[in-house]
Amino acid sequence: MYIFFPKLNPIIFTIGPVSARWYGFMYVISFLFAMWYGKKCSIKNKKIWYEKKIETLLYAIFLGSCIGGRIGYIIFYNFSYYSQNMLSVFYIWEGGMSFHGGLIGAIIVMSYFSFKYKKKILEISDFITPLIPFGLGAGRIGNFINSELWGRVSPNFSYAMIFPNSQNQDLKEIKKYPELQLLLDQYGALPRHPTQLYEFFLEGILLFFIIYFFSKKDRPTGSISGLFLIFYGLFRIFIEFFREPDPQIGLLKNIITMGQILSLPMIIAGLIIMYKSCYKK
């Protein structure tokens, strides 16, 4: 009735004490794709960035988004833990990144480049935006291989997936819904939405093509960035209804997730940018 999580090894290879993981590899290929696609796009739009500037910009944004993603996760999702375990802030191999924090980090970097090179920040973000969805999709594949960020329990969904490492969270579900005990006994874990794959499709594939086809024509400055903010925010809010809330936070007011709260300003900002770019004279 349900789909069992495939036996995927999150480690590609190990040399001595060092292990190369698929999740980290997804960051690498995302950066390489951004470098390749960014240079390809620059051929059509040399007035914005030349090749050397593109490399510098992408290196800086990659670093800024990684730092911002880490700080964002600490502040938005687990501040109480990290405030008492300061050294754990640097244990990035244990996971803990926030897209919204990474976005803030990238905006800070783009603001600096905007000031340095005397270009509008929306010109820079319009150039960067088409490079983002591939990385989002690759990251979700990394999450899937790690068997993390799975969805909520869904016993009535035939294509729900059995994630073997969800058992600790499953036991909490059993306390609230004792009738699920039979499923836990039968399958060893409760069936859940494979939300990593949902996000891979919506944020990675679908969003990539939306931005790709929209940006093929000349658009008003800021409209590409605005469109990305709107659709990412909508997709993220939608998926959060199926995704298991972070256990240390849960549902805020038993209604909304942190991811949904952080995505709402993205939609509002995207609408404002689109309006000012396309309709305001």
Curated annotation (Swiss-Prot):
Subcellular location per the Swiss-Prot or TrEMBL entry: Cell inner membrane
Protein keywords: Cell inner membrane, Cell membrane, Membrane, Transferase, Transmembrane, Transmembrane helix
Membrane topology, from the record: Multi-pass membrane protein
UniProt superkingdom: Bacteria
Residues annotated to bind a 1,2-diacyl-sn-glycero-3-phospho-(1'-sn-glycerol): 140
EC number of the protein: 2.5.1.145
GO BP terms in the entry: lipoprotein biosynthetic process
GO molecular function, one term: phosphatidylglycerol-prolipoprotein diacylglyceryl transferase activity
Keyword Transmembrane helix: yes
Keyword check for Transferase: yes
Classification via PROSITE patterns: LGT
Cited Pfam families: LGT
GO cellular component term, pick one: plasma membrane
InterPro entries referenced in this protein's UniProt entry, alphabetically: Lgt
Pathway: Protein modification; lipoprotein biosynthesis (diacylglyceryl transfer)
Spans through the membrane: 11-31, 57-77, 89-109, 121-141, 194-214, 222-242, 255-275
NCBIfam families: lgt
Annotated family: Belongs to the Lgt family.
Role played: Catalyzes the transfer of the diacylglyceryl group from phosphatidylglycerol to the sulfhydryl group of the N-terminal cysteine of a prolipoprotein, the first step in the formation of mature lipoproteins.
HAMAP family associated with the record: Lgt (MF_01147)
Protein's name in the database: Phosphatidylglycerol--prolipoprotein diacylglyceryl transferase
Native organism: Buchnera aphidicola subsp. Acyrthosiphon pisum (strain Tuc7)
